[in-house]
Amino acid sequence: MSKMNKKLSALFLALVLVLGMTACGGKATDGTTGSTDNTVTAEEEDHKTQNTKVDPNSPITEDMLRNHAVAPAEDFTYDVEDDGIKIRSYTGSDTVVVIPEEIEGKPVTGFYDYVFANDNPVRAVLIPESVKELEQVFTNNESVELVICEGVTIFRGLTFGDCSNLRQVILGENVQELVGIGTFTNCCRLMELHFTDALTSIDDEENFYGCDNLTIYGPADSYIESFAKEYEIPFVVE
């Protein structure tokens, strides 16, 4: 990406460093989120599958993640909101995490910042299609390798920023925007991303800063093709 800006501003570097050192905050229960104080430690709920062991020395494949056990509700703390469940933290021990589609009979619709960030040891996460936006969920996580997030339409700054071991992000067909900066910044092992005509806005080329091994795939004559060519990111028509 020789034409891409090869340096971040001092402000952006400071922001990444600060965010990389920020803790998840555990089971916070204050009312600063704009919703009523419904934070709970998830009670045990019925689930049909049990966790299976994953070899820590072997890469995790898409099939492995898709076929893995759904995490039980008690592995999370969360807020019960009018339109669904917003997850605050992951407290389980499994490093491969399939987020449940529902908790307490309500759809999982979002995450607070840093749920899987920093030193969280998760290696792979499958996010249900009921989640439409992500922001700073995985920031500065050096363990995560694979994320499936096929329902997300909007990514906000630093969703995957500084995830240096991230190899694969499987997107859905309806990604519309990369808002702000740093969505995939310094994901140096990320090999490919697939976008469709639904993508119409990328706020800044630094969303792909440091992605030196990345190839972007997308439709001919699309917004993403024009963007990739402008900033000399390898692009393949599909």
Where are these regions (language model features)?
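C-terminal motif of bacterial Sec signal peptides marking the signal peptidase cleavage site
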Residues: G20-A23
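N-terminal low-complexity, Pro/Thr/Ser-rich intrinsically disordered segments
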Residues: D37-V80
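Consensus positions within tandem repeat domains that build extended binding/scaffold surfaces
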Residues: Y114-V115, E135-V137, G157-T159, I181-T183, ...
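Bacterial signal peptide processing site
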Residues: G25-A28
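Conserved functional micro-motifs across diverse proteins
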Residues: K86-I87
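Short, structured coil segments at secondary-structure junctions
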Residues: K229-E232
